[in-house]
């Protein structure tokens, strides 16, 4: 999980989701997991 100021999808399987006011990227590739900090 990477904590970033700007979150963007890396590949076509990345999905942007809003959880508890935070933007999260979930993907089949675990390296692409991101959260806005």
Swiss-Prot record:
GO terms for biological process: translation. GO terms for molecular function: structural constituent of ribosome. Keywords: Chloroplast, Plastid, Ribonucleoprotein, Ribosomal protein. This is Large ribosomal subunit protein bL36c. It is found in: Plastid, Chloroplast. The lineage of its organism: Eukaryota, Viridiplantae, Streptophyta, Embryophyta, Tracheophyta. The gene is rpl36. Belongs to the bacterial ribosomal protein bL36 family. InterPro entries: Ribosomal_bL36, Ribosomal_bL36_sp. Component of the chloroplast large ribosomal subunit (LSU). Mature 70S chloroplast ribosomes of higher plants consist of a small (30S) and a large (50S) subunit. The 30S small subunit contains 1 molecule of ribosomal RNA (16S rRNA) and 24 different proteins. The 50S large subunit contains 3 rRNA molecules (23S, 5S and 4.5S rRNA) and 33 different proteins. GO terms for cellular component: chloroplast; ribonucleoprotein complex; ribosome.
């Amino acid at each position: 999980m990477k904590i970033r100021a700007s979150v963007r999808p890396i590949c076509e399987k990345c999905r942007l989701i809003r959880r508890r006011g935070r933007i999260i990227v979930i993907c089949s590739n675990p390296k692409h997991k991101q959260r806005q900090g």
